[in-house]
Amino acid sequence: MKVHEHQAKEIFRKYGLPVPRGYPAFDVKEAVEAAEELGTWPVVVKAQIHAGGRGKAGGVKLAKSIEEVQQIASELLGKKLATFQTGPEGLPVSRLYIEEATAIDKEFYVAITLDRSKSKPIIMVSAAGGMEIEEVAATNPEAIITQTIEPFIGLRSYHARELALKLGLPKNLLNKAASIFTTLYKIYIELDASMVEINPLVLTKDGNIVILDAKIEFDDNGLFRHPEIMEMDDPTQISPLEVEAKKFNLNYIKLDGNIACMVNGAGLAMSTMDTIKLAGGEPANFLDVGGSANATQIANAFKIILSDPNVKAIFINIFGGILRCDRLAEGIITAAKEVSINVPVIVRMEGTNVELGKKMLQESGLPLITADTMWEGALKAVEAANKQQ
């Protein structure tokens, strides 16, 4: 689960981290009141969406007067902001963050996340702050300094000081920077975060260090321990189809292609998407129905898939384990009775009760296209989608 910048900064404040003063605003009037409360000029008006690249997209602007705050707030609120992370459709701006401006000398990057290759947390720092870290990694990877964090030891002060030294921070700020790094790790662990990021952490012209932008992503599996964080969820920042999928415990992420996928297991789902790409197609979604899906959930998965007008074909790729193939077949038949399936459906099943599942589908009379392998299924899905164009 993602949260907005102003929510992440409020968490940072509670942990004693140096964050500029600022207030969220949900309408123009609140934006003006926030600027007046700050009482210093200029102020920064920031659109709040769950994506990076806001500055380049015009979502972060400097205001030098109340009139400018009103104008900028009116321009941003109620509109969609498109960045390189959102895609062309953008995300709705329903709130702003009004923050006191900071005189910047240097910008740095700091983040803690999970290194899946080592199954351990990792801290990344860079003197190339203010830029998108993906861009830095692609063009200047040596600019990113990383250190694996041993879970049984944690991030110690001497580790953090060494990282601050490598960043080239002034000696009088090494302890303060180290404290920021260790506190970030504390937040990462205590709040079950999957990523904590500061971009940028800035050295100000008066010789201080301040957090200018904050990002926290939380592990959904740990949210039951943090009801106060669950309340921060903003459903406007994800696709309505993703909101609907959550109601049925389906893992769904909308993509830009036209071949819908219905798969059990995240690994197989990603392999299926890769195979569709290799076959010349574009996946319309990631959809993991899980191992315990029943006929009702599968029917609801169909409804969600078919709600996407871009879908021209559906590729169902199931390896029957906990989710038996006959249960999948039952779900497909149930879905066909409840919704109008007006695009080609390609089915590839293997595993538990596969023969029974295939028999049920054959006897249903549904116009399904069958495949024996994932590659064959992907090729047939691409061919079927192209015919629908």
From Swiss-Prot:
Disulfide bonds: none annotated. GO terms for biological process: succinyl-CoA metabolic process; tricarboxylic acid cycle. Its EC number is 6.2.1.5. Keywords: ATP-binding, Ligase, Magnesium, Metal-binding, Nucleotide-binding, Tricarboxylic acid cycle. Succinyl-CoA synthetase functions in the citric acid cycle (TCA), coupling the hydrolysis of succinyl-CoA to the synthesis of either ATP or GTP and thus represents the only step of substrate-level phosphorylation in the TCA. The beta subunit provides nucleotide specificity of the enzyme and binds the substrate succinate, while the binding sites for coenzyme A and phosphate are found in the alpha subunit. Heterotetramer of two alpha and two beta subunits. This is Succinate--CoA ligase [ADP-forming] subunit beta.
